Amino acid sequence: MNGVLYITFTVILSVEVIIGNFGNGIIALVNIMDLAKRRKISSVDQILTALAISRIVLLWLVLVSWWLSMFYPGQWMTEGIDVIVHNVWTTLNQISLWLATSFSVFCFLKVANFSNTIFFYLKIRVKKVMTGTLIMFLLLLGLNIIVINASKTILIPEYKVNMSNSLNLKNTQISMLFPFANTLFGFIPFAVSLVTFLLLFFSLWKHQRKMHHGAQGCRDSSTKAHIRVLQTLIASILLYFVFFLSLVVKVWISLFLERMLLLLITQAAKIAFPSLHPWVLILGNAKLRKASLSALQWLRCRHKDEHRRVQRPEVHSCGSSCMP
């Protein structure tokens, strides 16, 4: 049973990494090529590019760590390397979460409309808001690193892979506060994203109430902008919720009997956010959507060409054998 779970999780993890790297790669490549062509890049494209690159590195870290733990279980995951991997994962994960949150805040400030002095002040100073978000992220990241490296440690169960490719339970000495810290510090950007979504929804509701005022064209364009951003944020919030829920479950995982199965499920759920979220961003952006369709069409044509090259020798050999 352990071997089946291990193989299933390996397949799921590999598929998630492939899907995530393809989506994040499209976002990064399109924006970098656009920067090289125009010699400038917008604020939202800067956020998306940094988000895509951080997620590519994060996904590769997870995949490489998993495969190394499979082939070199004893030599790879020593106590020192375990601490380094946790710190690097925490840093990349926090970067990914806060960049996704910054994107939500940016969209909210650009689309929403409130007759509030504070909101108007923030709306015309979007770059300063993004800078303030970055400073807050750096402070929280430093505090997070300090907490997970606290000197007080306990022995908790963690799954390791032995040479026979089966999963065994092994006691590993890590920070007692590590799972709680990840949940706590992961909740902060999630809460910010949720608040921006609710405020944007409230802005759309207020706009709908005032639809009988103003011109028809302006009314339609504002409504469409609200709905388009809300669609992106709804999908983002759902994926964010799955990610945060996986952190909460991991905290309480020791209370359940089938801990191995729950551990694999939560691990797969955590990777789903950086893997699937880029496709939500692509679908909500016309430029990225067009580039992704072009990339998929190119891959389809390449597949057809390879298929034809394989079939041609077979047809030729059959024709030659039939000749007298």
Swiss-Prot record:
GO terms under biological process: detection of chemical stimulus involved in sensory perception of bitter taste
TM regions (residue ranges): 3-23, 56-76, 95-115, 129-149, 184-204, 237-257, 262-282
Keywords assigned: G-protein coupled receptor, Glycoprotein, Membrane, Receptor, Sensory transduction, Taste, Transducer, Transmembrane, Transmembrane helix
Domain of life, source organism: Eukaryota
Subcellular location: Membrane
Cytoplasmic compartment segments: 24-55, 116-128, 205-236, 283-324
Keyword Transmembrane helix: yes
PROSITE patterns recorded: G_PROTEIN_RECEP_F1_2
Predominant location category: membrane
Membrane topology: Multi-pass membrane protein
Record InterPro entries: GPCR_Rhodpsn_7TM, TAS2R
GO CC field: membrane
Topological region Extracellular: 1-2, 77-94, 150-183, 258-261
Glycosylated residue positions: N162
Pfam families found in the cross-reference section: TAS2R
GO molecular function, one term: G protein-coupled receptor activity
UniProt KW Iron keyword: no
Function: Putative taste receptor which may play a role in the perception of bitterness.
Miscellaneous field: Several bitter taste receptors are expressed in a single taste receptor cell.
Recorded family membership: Belongs to the G-protein coupled receptor T2R family.
Name of the protein in question: Taste receptor type 2 member 116
Natural source organism: Rattus norvegicus
